[in-house]
Amino acid sequence: ESGAGDDTVIGDNGNAEFNETAILTRIETTAPTIGGSDTISTGQGTDIVLGGYDTDTIHTYDTSNTSDSTENDSDKVIGDNGKVTFENDGSISVFATTNAGTGAKDEIYTGNGGDIIAGGDGDDEIYACVISSSSTCNGNDQSRDIVLGDNGQATFDTHGILRKFISSDYGHESTLEANAAYTDTIHTGGGDDIIIGGIQADIIESGAGDDTVIGDNGNAEFDIPSWLDIDVQLKTPSDGLFTSADEWSIAADGNLTVFTFNDILPAIHREMAQSIRD
């Protein structure tokens, strides 16, 4: 438990590198099959957390305050093994899971703010929002969250602006085993969120905002270098192998663009998804 402040935490084994001006340039897990079940609480602040091996519970805000609207930090969390690299000025460069198949189910709670999250292996529960007493998003989060249910990578330009977001299994569906992916539960609040569930039957609940969701594996490429106004080109594999029925929910005052295969959708979004397939 690290409390408030800008914290950097590795649950199990890892390595952190700093440049000559003491700016963090790389953090990564090591010894990916050695570790235990961790409970990590970092409180408010811009935090970086790599859970490492085994089943972890990660909080980057005070979950006892279910009405918190002041926590608005941009956290970066990987539930299992992974790495995050930075430019010499501290802007993020690469956010990626590593050593797929060595992790486990995690619970991740990041609160408000523009968070970047990758669940990794296992049937993860991810809340990119402040949760209410009923374990749903309280609606205060208006920032863009980037969430990946399974394994993958986010790549940024030299200014720390997101350029590409891809699941590790994208383009490799024909070689996957049926047990190679996991059933995740993902909740995001308001804001124009971007979510890739990964294969298997995920449950995805996005709040108000213009959200973009890929139910299974996918690749999102960002063409306009603006965090506030992004033109997204998304791709999904055409075969739909090892995909399962996902469940979706979206707030009434938000818009949803869905790229998915064989999924359970409300009628209006099912028609949209069918037109995309065609």
Where are the regions a protein language model picked out?
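Extracellular repeat-rich scaffold modules on cell surfaces
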Residues: 42-44, 110-113, 187-193, 197-200
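Mobile, glycine-rich extracellular loop/lid and propeptide segments
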Residues: 12, 50-54, 60, 118-123, ...
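Acidic/polar low-complexity surface segments
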Residues: 5-42, 48, 59-109, 127-185, ...
